């Protein structure tokens, strides 16, 4: 087992090894794309937790690097592999619902049990500064599978909505 530490860039040593085929990236979001690009440029396939990138430019960097290096770059969207999602997909593919014309997706995750540690976590830094859903693929991934998006069909329009924060602020208020 190898360990890499001592600097912000120590992870690059892993990517530079000759005996590694794939790099699994499960760090904070702001490092995902840069790590993925670096790993592919050093001959590694890449598996990246969501979100794989935070900007369209980073997405294109990942795509272009993957195509240039001929290395796989896979976003690991765990919500498409859950029991409910796989069961629903199978039912749709078997025709249980008839022809599927419309789907809606969402990601609801009650974090109340985690708030004491989570509130000051790096994951919340983004949410403090921005609105929107950084885990949009959790809801859209299963919906796209049912509709065969990028498997014979494509998405023309996407509507994304965001509500005000309710549970987190209410929990914090209750604790203080």
Regions found by a protein language model. Give the residues of each.
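Short basic (Lys/Arg) and small-residue
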Residues: 50
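Short, solvent-exposed turn/loop segments enriched in Gly/Ser/Thr/Pro and often Arg
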Residues: 28-31, 53, 79-81, 109
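Predominantly a Rossmann-like dinucleotide-binding segment in NAD(P)-dependent oxidoreductases
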Residues: 69-72, 79-176
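Alpha-helical structural elements
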Residues: 6, 19, 76, 114-117
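N-terminal glycine-/serine-/threonine-rich beta1-alpha1-beta2 phosphate-ribose binding loop
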Residues: 1-45, 57-72
């Amino acid at each position: 087992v190898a360990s890499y530490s001592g600097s912000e860039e120590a992870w690059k040593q892993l990517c530079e090894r000759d005996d590694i085929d794939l790099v699994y990236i499960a760090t904070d979001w702001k490092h995902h794309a840069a790590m993925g690009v670096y790993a592919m440029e050093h001959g590694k396939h890449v598996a990246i937790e969501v979100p794989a990138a935070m900007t369209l430019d980073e997405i294109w960097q990942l795509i272009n690097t993957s195509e240039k290096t001929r290395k796989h770059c896979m976003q690991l969207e765990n919500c498409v592999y859950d029991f409910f999602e796989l069961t629903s997909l199978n039912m749709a593919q078997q025709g249980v619902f008839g022809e599927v014309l419309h789907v809606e997706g969402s990601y609801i995750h009650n974090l109340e049990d985690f708030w004491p540690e989570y509130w000051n976590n790096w994951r919340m830094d983004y949410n403090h500064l921005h609105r929107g859903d950084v885990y949009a693929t959790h809801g859209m991934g299963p919906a796209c599978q049912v509709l065969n998006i990028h498997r014979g069909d494509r998405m023309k329009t996407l509507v994304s909505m965001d509500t005000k924060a309710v549970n987190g602020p209410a929990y914090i208020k209750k604790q203080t």
